[in-house]
Amino acid sequence: MSDLQESLEKLSINEKAPQAPADDATPSNTTTLEKESSESAAAAAGEGAGEEGEEASASLYVGELNPSVNEALLFEIFSPIGQVSSIRVCRDAVTKKSLGYAYVNFHKHADGSRAIEELNYSLVDGRPCRIMWSQRDPSLRRNGDGNIFIKNLHPAIDNKALHDTFSAFGRILSCKVATDELGQSKCFGFVHYETAEAAEAAIENVNGMLLNDREVFVGKHVSKRDRESKFEEMKANFTNVYVKNLAPEVDNAKFEEIFKPFGPVTSVHLETDQEGKSRGFGFVNFENHESALNAVKEMNDKEIDGQKLYVGRAQKKRERLDELKRLYESTRLEKLSKYQGVNLFVKNLDDSIDSEKLEEEFKPFGTITSARVMVDDAGKSKGFGFVCFSSPEEATKAITEMNQRMIQGKPLYVALAQRKDVRRSQLEQQIQARNQMRMQNAAAAAGMPGQFMSPMFYGQQPGFFPPNGRGGAQGPFPPNPQMMMPRGGQMPPPQGQWPRAGPNGQPVPVYGMPPVYGGEFNGPNGQRQQRGAYPPNRNQKGGRPQRDLAAIISTVPVDQQKRILGEELYPKIVATGKAQEPEAAGKITGMMLDLENEEILALLEDDELFENHFEDALTAFEEYKKGEQAE
């Protein structure tokens, strides 16, 4: 017992204090941590299964990790302990971001034990990690016999301090202090022991003692289901009453006198400020439920000292917040249903248009219940507003007549008003659809089945084979002749029937195929030459100007327009130097060809616009390659 006393004194447990009330053993705000605690317990402490179970498992759960921690960093930390068989950082299935915990598997159980002893609560990328035995048996994880709850902890007490305090009573499977979004302690936590006896010893010795000058309460952990069932029972048999709108001159003595006629009062509490003045509300706790119920019935809305009192069942803070949220949500839905189909959103308003002018413009279409132009803090118009009609028919008529109408030299945009969350959801769906289309294009360019991809080949020109400097053929067929077929279905000439070279080393198109030019060819002196997508004008050295490209596109069949645009895009993509992989340029070209022809023409003329679309396509290609490598 001397060892136990010494251990407790190290953590400032100074003296025994009065026992905390049993009915307040577990607060309602432990729900968040309970989920975390169950996750910890889910990963925790296989060592509780006995020596035989321990020898069969050498898997550790490592929690509280920084999102930047990866498998390589964990291997550097754990490999000096012993031979590591595998490491897995758990990630979100969609975003692939770390969930903040990982599993480390050793070949030997002894190495796992040593890792817990030496590395538990050590800093990993600036955060103290929690290491426990992984327990994959759900029946053992959910066993709460050895689980205790501690509240009123000092904010300075972290996971390690809590572990050091309670490890004196037995073997700990998991230990955690609840924290908020900023990592600050919520002043309560959980300790899960291997045995129920160790938990009982901790409750007996630490409950009601001072830890860092704070009296702590330690009790058995009660599951959420049990708490809720108990809470419903407490609500039906409440004894604690909340009173507000009290006059400033009401003190504790007068407060008690007001409620004594309804039954025996066990305690009263009047809330005061720092100066000791009443804050106008307090609590009265009766000995039995009947007295509390009578007080609520008789005193609610009764006037005392010129103030109409509110008297009702005392609620926990969380319960009250939930009730307010439900009330707010019902009010919001009622308001939305009331204005569904009658409230219009109007934008592109001139700065001179105010709410009165807006109402005048829309008044001919029906009865307006409200019209408002939104303004900033300085009172200047934001360029948009809302008009609410009395019926959906009037609103529909206003949309038909006023949308795109010129007002003060600006065309109005008029549509049904949407909630912010609906607009955000629609935008997210559009972005998701666009990203999905890009990924489909990348997959199609990679030749995955089930995806349609226009047959094109970017490396040699479809429709002919490049002649050498002497006018003969050079090199074998391309690796995939089908990729060279035009959509019209013409086949390249059989092997051995090579087209001869034309004047100036220009290739002669294969019979029946459109004369599409471009790609790299051998010139008269055997040099590589880059040509445009169209035959160059004899009177000029370069290819056609981009401004003529749209006119030329309009003269060719629809099924060949993408091919021609692709021959323009491909050399431009290659020229960026960013498509490093052999097949990258061709696949990115295929992705960018998914745009409308007008957009592609704009890309070819605007380098900045081209760069933006190229970067998006390159990113999609790189993500696809990473996913392919992972598979």
From Swiss-Prot:
Task performed by this protein: Binds the poly(A) tail of mRNA. Appears to be an important mediator of the multiple roles of the poly(A) tail in mRNA biogenesis, stability and translation. In the nucleus, involved in both mRNA cleavage and polyadenylation. Is also required for efficient mRNA export to the cytoplasm. Acts in concert with a poly(A)-specific nuclease (PAN) to affect poly(A) tail shortening, which may occur concomitantly with either nucleocytoplasmic mRNA transport or translational initiation.
GO biological process, any: mRNA 3'-end processing
Gene3D superfamilies assigned to the protein according to its UniProt record, in alphabetical order: 3.30.70.330, c-terminal domain of poly(a) binding protein (1.10.1900.10)
Protein name: Polyadenylate-binding protein, cytoplasmic and nuclear
One Pfam family, short name: MLLE
Keyword list, A-Z: Cytoplasm, mRNA processing, mRNA transport, Nucleus, Repeat, RNA-binding, Translation regulation, Transport
A GO molecular-function descriptor: ribonuclease inhibitor activity
Boundaries of every RRM domain copy: 58-136, 146-223, 239-316, 342-419
Lineage, top ranks: Eukaryota, Fungi, Dikarya, Ascomycota, Saccharomycotina
Domain of life: Eukaryota
Subcellular location: Cytoplasm; Nucleus
Region (Disordered) location: 1-56, 518-545
Domain PABC: from-to ranges: 545-626
Organism name: Meyerozyma guilliermondii (strain ATCC 6260 / CBS 566 / DSM 6381 / JCM 1539 / NBRC 10279 / NRRL Y-324) (Yeast)
Family assignment from sequence similarity: Belongs to the polyadenylate-binding protein type-1 family.
